[in-house]
C-alpha cells in the first residue's frame, strides 16, 4: 500500500528532498511509526512530498508530478495555513476565500478524477498565540470551506483544529505543541502523527 503525504512545511518538516521516502521530522514520521505498529505485517510504501511554504495554488501546480504520476493508494493533504499566513507581512500575497476554495476544490477534483486514491483531508490549524490573532480570525473563515470540501471529496476528514482545541483543555499550554502556533515541535508532531494513524486505521484495514 502506497501512502503519500502532501502539504506545506508542517508535512515537509526538514525532509531530504533527494529522497522522497525520507519522512522528515514532523507528523509523517510519527504517523508512519504508529501505522507500522498497528499493521506490523502489512507492506507499506510511504512517500513525503510536502514543500515548505506551499499554498493551495502551488500544490495544484505540482499535483501532476507530485501525486498523479505516483498513483498512491492513499493521499493525505494538509494545506491552507500559508494561504492565510501570506496575507500578512512584507511580501504578502492575497488569497481570497473564494480563490482558496477554487484552488482546493481543483486539487481534490483532479485527484478524484485522475487517481484511484483514497483522500484524507486534514484541516489546517493555528494554536493560540497573541501575535497571530488576526491570522486566526482569517483561518476561521477558511475552516468551513475545508470541511465542506472534505464532505464532497474526502474519504477521511481530520478536524485537526478541533482536535487541538480539545487537547488544550487538558494540556493548556500551546507551547507544549508548537513554538509559534503553526509548526509543531516534537510533541506536536507526535500528537498529529498519532491522531492521523487513529483516523486512517479503518481506511487502511479496509484496503489491505
Locate each region found by the language model.
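Surface-exposed cleft-lining segments at the edges of enzyme active sites
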Residues: 49-51, 55, 84-99, 129-134
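Catalytic His-Asp segment of secreted/periplasmic serine-dependent ester chemistry enzymes
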Residues: 125-208
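Charged, glycine-enriched surface loops/patches
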Residues: 95-122, 143-155
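Serine-esterase "nucleophile elbow" of acetyl-processing enzymes
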Residues: 1-52, 57, 62-71
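Active-site segments of SGNH/GDSL-like serine hydrolases
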Residues: 78, 82, 108-143
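Structural recognition of the beta-strand scaffold that forms the well-ordered cores
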Residues: 3-5, 45-48, 74-78, 119-123, ...
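Proline-aspartate-enriched helix->loop->beta-strand connector
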Residues: 67, 71-77, 81
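Short glycine-enriched, charge-decorated loop/helix-capping segments at active-site entrances
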Residues: 17-22, 90-97, 134-137, 178-179
Amino acid at each position: 500500500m502506497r501512502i503519500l503525504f502532501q502539504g506545506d512545511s508542517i508535512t515537509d518538516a526538514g525532509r531530504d528532498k533527494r529522497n522522497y521516502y525520507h519522512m522528515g521530522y514532523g507528523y509523517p514520521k510519527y504517523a508512519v511509526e504508529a501505522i507500522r505498529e498497528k499493521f506490523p505485517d502489512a507492506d507499506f510504501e510511504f512517500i513525503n512530498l510536502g514543500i515548505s511554504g506551499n499554498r493551495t495554488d502551488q500544490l495544484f501546480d505540482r499535483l501532476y508530478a507530485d501525486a498523479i504520476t505516483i498513483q498512491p493508494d492513499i493521499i493525505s493533504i494538509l494545506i491552507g495555513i500559508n494561504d492565510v499566513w501570506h496575507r500578512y507581512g512584507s511580501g504578502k500575497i492575497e488569497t481570497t476565500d473564494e480563490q482558496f476554495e477554487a484552488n482546493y476544490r481543483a486539487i481534490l477534483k483532479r485527484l478524484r478524477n485522475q487517481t484511484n486514491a483514497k483522500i484524507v483531508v486534514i484541516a489546517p490549524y493555528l494554536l493560540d498565540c497573541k501575535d497571530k490573532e488576526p491570522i486566526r480570525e482569517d483561518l476561521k473563515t477558511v475552516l468551513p470551506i475545508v470541511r465542506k470540501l472534505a464532505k464532497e471529496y474526502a474519504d477521511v476528514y481530520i478536524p485537526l483544529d478541533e482536535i487541538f482545541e480539545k487537547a488544550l483543555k487538558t494540556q493548556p499550554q500551546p507551547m507544549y505543541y508548537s513554538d509559534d502556533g503553526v509548526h509543531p515541535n516534537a510533541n506536536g508532531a507526535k500528537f498529529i502523527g498519532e491522531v492521523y494513524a487513529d483516523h486512517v486505521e479503518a481506511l487502511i484495514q479496509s484496503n489491505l
